[in-house]
Curated annotation (Swiss-Prot):
PROSITE patterns: RIBOSOMAL_L13 (PS00783). Keywords: Ribonucleoprotein, Ribosomal protein. InterPro entries: Ribosomal_uL13, Ribosomal_uL13_bac-type, Ribosomal_uL13_CS, Ribosomal_uL13_sf. This is Large ribosomal subunit protein uL13.
Length: 147
């Protein structure tokens, strides 16, 4: 009888991937990136161990928002002071802070808790085509083949 393989945190091998977000719908990109961050693309996936890889997303400012999401999708946060509810649309985020728009979208698709926060730290988002992780020799990943 065979036993199920359970990954241990010390023996996980991690890769670096580069994903180009140009004209890719935000939700489809986020779900594919979240899957890689969790490690669900590996045969050694274990739900309670961080088996995921590092992901670098470039050209975040060129991500596609389909339909009327640029004006109708609203992100809320509160400053914990009376009357401190802040609201920004997805279009505002795409113009002013596209890195945060993509990070919020991916973070919402990761587990809630310490493991999800640990996995979210492996995401690196950049506005343009340049990034500072060339030393890690990242592998280019075509996101259209994953969706």
């Amino acid at each position: 009888m065979r036993t199920t393989y359970i990954a241990k945190p010390g023996e996980v091998e991690r890769k670096w991937y580069v994903v180009d977000a140009t004209d890719v719908p935000l939700g489809r990109l986020s779900s594919a990136v979240a899957s890689i961050l969790r490690g669900k693309n590996k045969p050694t996936f274990t739900p309670n161990v961080d088996t995921g890889d590092y992901v670098i997303v470039i050209n975040a400012e060129k991500v596609a928002l389909t339909g009327r999401k640029a004006s109708n999708k609203v992100y809320y946060h509160h400053s914990n002071h009376p009357g401190g509810l802040k609201a920004r649309t997805a279009g505002d985020y795409r113009e002013k802070d596209p890195e945060k728009l993509l990070a919020l979208s991916v973070k919402g698709m990761l587990p809630k808790g310490t493991l999800g926060r640990q996995q979210a730290k492996k995401l690196h988002v950049y506005r343009g085509a340049d990034h500072k992780h060339e030393a890690q020799q990242p592998e280019v990943l075509d996101i259209n083949k994953l969706i």
